[in-house]
Structures are given as C-alpha cells and as structure tokens.
C-alpha cells in the first residue's frame, strides 16, 4: 500500500493545532500554474497561541514550511525579505518548520525541526 502524499504545510497545520495553536493557510496558489505566493514573501501559515501558564500574552506567528533538507535555503530567503524584518519589529514571530522522514527500526515516521527566526 502506497503512503498518501501529505505536504509539509499539512503536516505543520496538524502539528501546530495539536500543540494548541490556531492556524490558517495564508499562501495563495496561482490558478493554472504550479506556483504559490507566500504571505509577505515568507509565510505559508498564520497562527496564534496564548501562553497563560507563562504569564505571557498571546503570540502571533507566520510559519514557513519546507522539507528538512531545504531549511537553510528558506532561512536565507526569509532573512533577505525586508517585510520579514518589519514583521519581527512589529512584534510578530517567524517559525520555520522543516520536515524529514526518519527510520525507527521497521517504522518510518515524520519529524519536524522547528526554528524561530530572529534578526
């Protein structure tokens, strides 16, 4: 039986929601083309979460999702984007999610690497 194809974006939505984030997709697909446009040039998902146990107000974040092997390229892209700097200065956060398949004996499982992007 073949494994169904799940995108990094779908994996991140499921992971974030399981960890208490409220999530929405903000990347746009171009009709009749195989291209997507990220929000502000770097965001696939917009999410927010409150941290009452930490005594902190809610966080808002844009999430860039990718494969584990493509994280460095995505980080470089984000850091080169002037709107990313403005987003961070305005109090938003940027989270980079890199997904990779790992083997645990006969089982194959997906693992996320999270990286908060800062100036």
Give names to the regions the model predicted:
Residues 1-119:
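Catalytic phosphate/metal-binding cores of nucleic-acid and nucleotide-processing enzymes, i.e., regions
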């Amino acid at each position: 039986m073949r494994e169904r194809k799940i995108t990094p974006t779908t994996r991140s939505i499921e992971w974030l929601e399981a960890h208490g984030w409220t999530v929405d997709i903000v990347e746009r697909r171009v009709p009749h083309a195989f291209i997507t446009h990220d929000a502000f040039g770097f965001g696939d998902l917009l999410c927010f979460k409150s941290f009452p146990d930490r005594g902190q107000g809610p966080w808002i974040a844009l999430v860039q999702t990718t494969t584990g092997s493509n994280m460095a390229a995505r980080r470089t892209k984000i850091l080169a984007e002037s709107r990313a700097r403005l987003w961070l200065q305005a109090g938003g956060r940027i989270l980079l999610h890199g997904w990779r398949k790992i083997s645990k004996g006969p089982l194959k499982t997906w693992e996320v690497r999270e990286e908060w992007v800062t100036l």
